[in-house]
Amino acid sequence: MNLIQQLEQEEIARLTQNKTIPAFAPGDTVIVQVKVKEGTRERLQAYEGVVIAKRNRGLNSNFIVRKISSGEGVERTFQTYSPLVDSIEVKRRGDVRRAKLYYLRERSGKSARIKEKLNYKAPAAKKA
């Protein structure tokens, strides 16, 4: 392991020492609690939607969550190890055959539904 990878691993360990990141995949419905600063106040905002893409790149890992808000599709990219992401909760496991679900952007209504994965055996959540 080279020096940069070692430093990234140490930074990931530091950022995740008091929170756990569950194992989730594209197709899963997640609730992401995001820290939002409004003036002097800081509060948590829940963002619930379907994970349409996940990018595993160490410290630069991110994932895209898509939801329908007021009939309009909204996508938001979250950095997995960002201090602004307070927690990630998997609400429902989706059964999909693709790693990137960008085709959901063109679909709406019943054609955009994702089948639920039954009897899912989750790998252990990452605890650094």
UniProtKB/Swiss-Prot annotation:
Belongs to the bacterial ribosomal protein bL19 family. This is Large ribosomal subunit protein bL19. PROSITE patterns: RIBOSOMAL_L19. One of its GO terms (molecular function) is structural constituent of ribosome. It comes from the Bacteria. The gene is rplS. The keyword Glycosyltransferase does not apply. This protein is located at the 30S-50S ribosomal subunit interface and may play a role in the structure and function of the aminoacyl-tRNA binding site. Keywords: Ribonucleoprotein, Ribosomal protein. GO terms for biological process: translation. It comes from Aromatoleum aromaticum (strain DSM 19018 / LMG 30748 / EbN1). One of its GO terms (cellular component) is cytosolic large ribosomal subunit.
